[in-house]
Swiss-Prot record:
It comes from Schizosaccharomyces pombe (strain 972 / ATCC 24843). This is Meiotically up-regulated gene 79 protein. The gene is mug79. Gene3D superfamilies: Pleckstrin-homology domain (PH domain)/Phosphotyrosine-binding domain (PTB). CDD domains: PH. Appears to have a role in sporulation. It is found in: Nucleus. Pfam families: PH, Sec7.
Amino acid sequence: MDFRITEGSSPTSLSVSEKIAKLESCNDSRITCRPVRESKPTYTSGQKHSALLSKLKRSKVTTDFCKLEESKGIICQENLHTEGAKSKTENISGEDKSSQRRTRLKQIQEFISHRRSFLNSNANSVESEKILAENNHMFNVKSKLSNKESFIKTRRPRTNGELSDLSLQPKRIFSEPVNSHPSQSMFGNGVRASSGSYSLKRDLKDYEEELPSSKKRQRTPPPIVVTNFPQEIFPSKKISLSAKRRIQGKYSGENVRARIELARERNRKRDYVSNLSKGHTTNALEENPFNLGPNYRASTRKCNRIKEAINLFAAKNGSMEVPPKVSVGDSVLTTSQKFLQVIREKTALLMNQDSNSVQPQALAAAESPTTKAPTTKAPTSEAPPKGHVKQLAKQLGNIYMPQSINNVEPTSHSSISKVVNPSEKVISKIERACLAGNGNVHPSIKMEKNLELNPHPRTLNATEHKINSRIQVSKLNTKNELANADPKMYLLENLSDRLYFCKLAKLLLRKYPLDIAEHQFALVYSRFQRIPLKQISCLKQSLVAYYSVLSEVGITNEIMLRENRFSSPKTPEGLVSISKLLLDDREHLSHDERSYIQQLQSQIKSQSVHHENAAEEIRKMRNLRNSRINSQQVGEKVFVNPDVKTMDIQETFLQDYEDETFANEGLSASKFKEEFLLISDSKSDLNSEEIATPNSLEFKNNPRIKVPRSLLTILNLHDRSQLKLFEVCHNSEFKDPINLSNCLRNLLEKQLLSYNFTDWFASLGSEYENVYVKFISHYDFSSLNVYASFQKLCCDLYYGSDDYIHSPILQVFASCWLKQNSNYGFLNEDIIVKIVLILIDLHKSTYSKKLNSYVVPMETFVKYALEKLRPLISPDSVCILSKEDKKHWLKYKKNRSTFAKLLFSTWSNLPSDIGFILECMLKEYYDTFLKSPFAVPNAVQAQLHNQVRGDLTPKRNRSSLISELMKSSKLLKQESSGNKNSTSLESDAFKESSFVLNEENGGIYAGKEIDLPEPSVIDGRPHFSVFNYTHHMQEEKTHNRLPWHRRGMISYKKMVLSKNNRWVAGYWKKKYCIVDSGKLIFYKSDHLDPNACSNVSPIHREFGLQSCLASPNLPPSINSNRNNVFYLNIPGNECYLFEAPSVLAMNEWIHSLNFNAAMITCPPLPENITNTEYGWGYILTRAEKKAYYTAADGTKTFVGDLAQLTRWSPMDIQGLQDIPRPLRDKVHILRDCVPSLLETCLLFQSLPEKMEKCFAAGSKNYLKAMDNWNRKMKFLYERSMMYKEYQRVLECEYEYRKSHDFYPTLSPVRYPYDFKGL
């Protein structure tokens, strides 16, 4: 087989710039080089139309109707195949055959032309059947089903809320590609392995001149029915096969982790509901391990009946229709875009009135569902004032969605991560409401309807009071008169039913428009209460709004309080019921809450159970949830029930709204933040009512910590409870160095400064030298040597910062040490600073981030230090040494050889006694260094632990707490009109200083890269090189979010490449697989329990993933009729096909496989230079001098034909395993090697032009050399694309960690001093 590059994708036919652009633009890992087959298709006699007839038979003729201009008769389409089967052949003469052939050709032309025109205009079915009956003698097809029945069965759409059995659902339609050859072999389970690509043109070669010259249309395969794709990725439930492949390729690697976090929970709930309806107990037990009994099943049936009623109503109103076919380029509105659209409509309606106040009539008109708001903003004659749009948005938010965040009951729940928006139409997609699974409370908790027995009567919170005061609805009485009504009167007494309708209201508002949600909620509520729908028709809007604002966590806690579960549990059954109730919502619990649940279960299951201990654990759970109910405001955005797992997604969701608001006002977001932080105020009013807290009396004895605004960037705030400890003041109050140094010391003692405090403090510059002096003067360096004194300073200031080394802090430290200690006579500040710098270099070179730490010998260290200190020692220096010091240094003189005497003898005018003292000092520091290295601040140590352990728990954004602190401190008041000029001058002065946070220096400290020592320096723990993924997964309990670990049941099929280059496929298997530590493991058991599979079940197969690549783009020779199929390419002659349950699961598997393969694959090694000739070695060098020799008879003998060529093959296809490296180092290595691989591939493409000059055309050596070139070119191209995909996956993971504080910005640097070379 001659492997060559096709003309369309040949890199040799392009220019140099086009070649580089083509190589750089290759995002997928498929090979554009395709082999060219020499075999030609063979046809039997009399079968020239066989290809055309086979195409017409395989196409869905039964589903299409065609129309001719001149119709002759009417025949039902159902008789198309039956009458064609009854047609008889007759023996005719040669003239009759030719005439019949011409008529059949004309009928074929008419049939094809009118079939093409059918897509643009729908033909009449009666006329189409008539024409098809005329052409019936051309086809000889047998079909068991009629066309109409097959059309209805295959194209029946599926409703959204259908909970029927999957066996009754329509099967997906698979259409074969056009370029498949009839001679292809079909393997089992829907996979076709093809050996070549052929088209219909070769079969119609005889009729090429007679056919019309219209453009050959490529038949579009019929669309398939997609059921499990999420709405964010696939907006329509019907999508073509080609569009599906393109979208899968587009979303296979981009923002995988963010999309997984957004849609994983919704897919899990959908699968759970479908499994319950099917009666699968295995999946049901997996999601709900507690058997809830017949009451729970009854409630599930009740939910299904309600859902069927909702679907029936939506079907009548046309809301559940299957949307039309959507192309790839169409845009779909996401939640944030819908939110922006609502804000634009309401803002445009209010701005047309050109008034600053909002009238209730206009707001009511804007909210009415019948009003059609314009999609674009109405132009206004006059520009609105600055801040007008933001003010209108606040007014809309106060009216349509009351933001009662101050007086919320202290009951939290991590499952509700709701964003309070200015419109109640939009509820965040992150809010998880389960309609069928958690709709009712556990049946063991019985509700007492008698309110007298309730020791904790329910009181309406501020949100409900606010709604009751603002929402006034009308009730239709018998005389058709409107009277005031309150939705409170329709509040259900049973708390379980109240909780159910609360979740139902939130689900309807998130899923449907406002008018449909109101009507559906009223319909379900009326059927449940058995009251006429007309009675609550006027309360539709108020009912759904009232129930949607109720807190699910508040109702649940009230259920528990009625039974006195938390205060004094009396029976073990009560504890079991509460633990089951909490575990019903275990998916939304944090890791701390899960640990409390596990402790509670262990205590309940033990024989000697202590009810008081269990009650204490439940109390901890309640306190933890209470601390998380507090709302959080980030700038203009308010978050209720902030969840650490979804905080970053919420900020991304509201980012578009914030940018749009700033754009409407003509103010950028960065400029707004700058003005928000830089408005100066000399006097702060801290005695207002808004700032006063319930325990404000305590601050009289314990005042708050005054903090300047310049320190807000380095504060380390863990939660909102620490906000009451601070009082933000103006920077002018800390002009005194003593005040600022005392503030820093106070914050350091309370561990409230972040790890980048050293960079911030060192960047102040020499202007704040007095601050450095006052800060270091707090330390006591008396009777301590230089090493011990600097080690004491390192507990607060990190020695690994580059700014710290080059700042005047070390000079101040040297002067303070000299003042507190006796001078030896020759020591000065420069010598002490140089000794400190040498010690820092010793630490960096010894404890750098390398596989094996290199310890510098003592002799090398002393010699290097003395050479650095020699220029700083004056020849006139006098050594002053006491008797105690001489006795202290005497042991170094007797036991060890001295270098100082030898070195100082070579240096003129330098006393030897000074060299002896320096040598003894350096040896003592070296011994101390081996025992106790420099200390690391606590904040840097915590950041280092997160880096080494790969801590993937998102941390709360510090800027949100700082913004709230700034807002609560009332620093943004303007001075009186008489002091405006002085205030502006003061503000301009602070803008230029380095103290103030502005747009230029705002993020300089957060992105600062500082170096860290090895973890063994701190606590003796190993680094990433010997890091155990499984141990870390068990310790952190976040294996679902780790990219290097993936486990679960998956269907797969093994494909093997045979000798004739055809893929031989096996059959589909379903096994339990684990991807971890660079390996893919298949277990023989198909059990769902991971512990049973990994501990008990034997291993079916295990292999390393080095040099492997997973991709959703199947090779051209492999076709599959299954959805969500991807393949794993293994070096050699085999690959694996995998089928995932959804697109999100497929992306998770692909990302995990490629991540493990990239981490374990060794970087590309340099090619071995051998004497073996393949066609491009020494022959090309000889051909440059003389390409051929001419004989006497004129024949030419080329140099290449005289050489003996060898078949080329790669040395090691599987590749070598790389040593364990940190993720950052792996990314840097791939960034360096990928461009070199592309350059090598580009240079190798230019060799055929030189090879043609040294070989005779068509000679044996020429064919062998070109075959070697094709083989190596394919290998280089595949390898470069593989490493390019590795680089993309690792960079995506690395940038995701950095942006979410998973992987901190602490990277190693190269040190200027390297002791290895000495």
